[in-house]
């Protein structure tokens, strides 16, 4: 299972970033006349385990940087080498890996460290450092913290993972088959996976689950269960076949032993991704459902 804190290869600086819409709260005002940083996230960033620090230079100064780091009691990234020049009036996005949250207290917003103390530190070509304040304009820094603390809480109670993924023939075309495994850790009581979402290229099927039934149940006192699953081709249109940003982001709804329900992302191990995609694409071809641009 791939976690949000996994080590990932991070690409070079990008010039644009699409902020994640995470809340209906009023926008946070941006300061003027200073250097500051805004955490943002592109659509492909979650699967890469990263986010962007959007650097705003609202001064007359020029900064030639060689590295960047996001520092906060909630999480601190490694120092990442980045080469960029930021002149007055310019905004530049730099990707940094999300390291996983350092959860305070129960990991809720009530015990979350204050973002007033967060900073982005730039290392300049002369070896000096410049510290920028963080403005969580889109509440992304907060969301990453809260979601990861929720995930860590679930992981401490039960392991949830895809296992034994392999190609299988179903009605004359290849599909990916395997099992969903639940393994008890520190949690007590019954744990239920109520549902698992589809993604753009894949339709999730719980083989032995009746319509409207739960995908998997780990009864109280039982240490482990596995249920058979399949990933069928979902869409075969050009947009679906070109989907590379979040093709394996399967979102499960989990009910823990205390009765609380939580979303939980179950990524297959990255080593499975290419084979899963090749199987779904081949199924589209065999079924004659591939659509081409301009085809009516």
Segments from the language model and where they lie:
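N-terminal low-complexity, Pro/Thr/Ser-rich intrinsically disordered segments
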Residues: 10-37
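Extracytoplasmic/luminal low-complexity segments enriched in Pro/Gly and acidic/polar residues
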Residues: 205-296
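Intrinsically disordered, low-complexity Pro/Gly/Ser/Thr-rich segments with frequent PxxP/GP/PP motifs
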Residues: 68-108, 199-239
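Bacterial signal peptide processing site
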Residues: 4-8
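Terminal connector regions
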Residues: 102-145, 236-272
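Surface-exposed interaction/gating patches
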Residues: 152-235
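Acidic, serine/threonine- and proline-rich intrinsically disordered appendage/tail regions
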Residues: 9-10, 23-27, 41-47, 142-182, ...
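Short acidic, flexible loop segments centered on an aromatic residue
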Residues: 56-77, 185-205
């Amino acid at each position: 299972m791939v976690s949000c804190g996994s080590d990932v290869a991070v690409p070079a600086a990008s010039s644009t970033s699409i902020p994640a819409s995470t809340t209906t709260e009023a926008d946070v005002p941006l300061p003027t006349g200073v250097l500051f940083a805004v955490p943002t996230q592109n659509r492909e960033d979650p699967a890469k385990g990263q986010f962007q620090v959007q650097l705003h230079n609202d001064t007359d100064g020029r900064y030639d940087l060689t590295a960047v780091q996001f520092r906060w009691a909630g999480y601190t990234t490694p120092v990442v080498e980045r080469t960029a020049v930021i002149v007055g009036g310019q905004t530049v996005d730099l990707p940094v890996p999300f390291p996983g949250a350092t959860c305070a207290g129960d990991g809720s917003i009530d015990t979350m460290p204050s973002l007033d103390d967060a900073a982005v530190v730039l290392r300049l070509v002369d070896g000096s450092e410049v510290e920028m304040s963080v403005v969580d304009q889109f509440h992304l820094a907060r969301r990453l913290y809260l979601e990861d603390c929720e995930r860590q809480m679930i992981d401490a109670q039960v392991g949830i993972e895809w296992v034994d993924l392999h190609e299988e023939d179903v009605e004359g075309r290849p599909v990916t088959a395997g099992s969903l495994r639940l393994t008890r850790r520190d949690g007590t009581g019954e744990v239920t996976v109520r549902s698992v979402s589809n993604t753009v290229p894949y339709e999730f099927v719980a083989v032995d689950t009746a319509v409207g039934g739960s995908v998997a149940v780990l009864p109280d006192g039982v240490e482990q269960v596995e249920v058979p699953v399949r990933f069928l081709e979902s869409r075969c249109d050009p947009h679906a076949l070109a989907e590379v940003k979040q093709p394996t982001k399967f979102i499960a709804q989990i009910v823990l032993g205390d009765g609380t329900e939580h979303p939980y992302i179950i990524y297959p191990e990255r080593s499975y991704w290419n084979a899963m995609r090749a199987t779904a694409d081949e199924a589209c071809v065999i079924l004659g459902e591939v659509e081409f641009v301009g085809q009516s």
